[in-house]
């Protein structure tokens, strides 16, 4: 075993050797050892009569008979993610970030794995490396720009996709990649503020040092407009996403993290193309004519239905894909049935309930177990200005009318009836009221499966729309015949 990140300071090489001997003995007694080849020595002196520094290149320090390499003026060593040379801390650079992002892009990984590498490893590493008094605002902006460029390449997002979709938290509907430009100044500002307000009077005087005070004022300028704390920064990115073309309605799932679980753990049956389309679906970025950058006269649906070809229109109301949203609905309802049957529920789909006035009701699922009857209707709506809870309460109210309950009691006499609904957003948003159905049926892990099937169904609807509209426009000819 080796002890990492240990630095010994001394006024001369003799004192340094004594410290090195003490450290070697200390670790030896605890079963540890210093590794000379992974260590570095930096010996700096002042040229007599001149204000110039020089470095010793002769080996002055040894561990176990092995010399510790001496650093030259061109060398540096790493400590806690930062680089140091004989003149102090090296100014942070984004070149290493650029190199690591390029490696991730070219790696033989799936898009979901690449996104995880960027979010949880590359960006997280530089969150520490760039926390330096020598960091510049330009370096932070360049770092964010490189990260966004890499994410857009990995996920095939167009240049017009909003930055907020990349930086907003997953719970708020984004991809959860933190903004280094926003977070690093806020983190350093918070740390200096804690030092200034500490109970230790000696530590609190640090901010009275002119250089530290100047840097603190710089951080105050850099954090203007974003709340100054990481919590407020995340909320601000969520607000920007909600106000954008991509994020409208996605915040409805922010009380539960289940709506974005697939971003980190996509289902096994998804291909890389499925994952990319799911990300673009979530951000309202699948190709349509109704995007704001198109002139108004070019936004009409290519199916000829005289409506704006928005993604919500394609997925929910276009006659060209009439049957595919129905199949998506049936797929989600069928999946809920499969899960319920595994838990011992007797399930009947689209039970025909004839009411006293002769009208007919056909709830999607009627489930029976013991003395309990659960009536559940499934609906998939667009995440827009209207909350998903509105659709939920409408469904429950529709099947909670007394004539409907009477028809159910006639079919199942002596049993208690519970009317519930399953409401999903077309982009994979989970309505919190759905927890009533999963709790009643004891389906603790059903949410992810239902959401994934809904997303996959929406992807199929869009693909069929693009295929059918292209076939119509070309008269059935293939792309190579045009």
UniProtKB/Swiss-Prot annotation:
Residues 1-84 form the Reverse transcriptase domain. Keywords: Endonuclease, Hydrolase, Nuclease, Nucleotidyltransferase, RNA-directed DNA polymerase, Transferase, Transposable element. Its EC number is 2.7.7.49. It catalyses: DNA(n) + a 2'-deoxyribonucleoside 5'-triphosphate = DNA(n+1) + diphosphate. Residues 208-482 are annotated as: Nucleic acid-binding endonuclease. The keyword Nucleotidyltransferase applies. InterPro entries: RT_dom. The keyword Hydrolase applies. One of its GO terms (molecular function) is RNA-directed DNA polymerase activity. This is Retrovirus-related Pol polyprotein from type-1 retrotransposable element R2.
